């Protein structure tokens, strides 16, 4: 863990309220796929998961939902390229088990996708042959982000597939990530779950009922 400043390189709008912030990665800053950093705003600290792979040495990325009036959100909303931002980290025990050979199931809702994206990129960039399935849930079509990136990755890597589900669509299929995973064969899987508490609890219970032991069910509540 270290205190450091990182220069903001770029800001990309992913949805109406989600932004991708890319920072220069300072020398000596290392992390495991799935961990988070604390953004320092005066006397207040806010936790944000790193959404990039540790193998990306030049930069690191945060995916942030901007909340009206939120200290971290308002600070980042006003941030401009070349600004230096104060951080502390990395933190967290929600990270990839690199020694496992089990299939990987990534389940996320909203910006709970961020640490899962880090894990996904790391696995694919490191040449892992483990089967990887991603299940991503949001409310509306306009809340979906990174779809094109997932489509591109799934075309390049035969061991990766993904599904996106909407809980409040204007039309078409409606459901939750818990509905999606019930259709899957997860016997030899390791689950990484990140999102709201109700979803995390439901998915944990499902994997437990399927006989997956606790050490193979990793979770973080957003």
Question: Locations of the language-model features?
Answer:
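A short, basic/flexible loop-to-alpha-helix module at the beginning of a structural domain
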Residues: 89-101
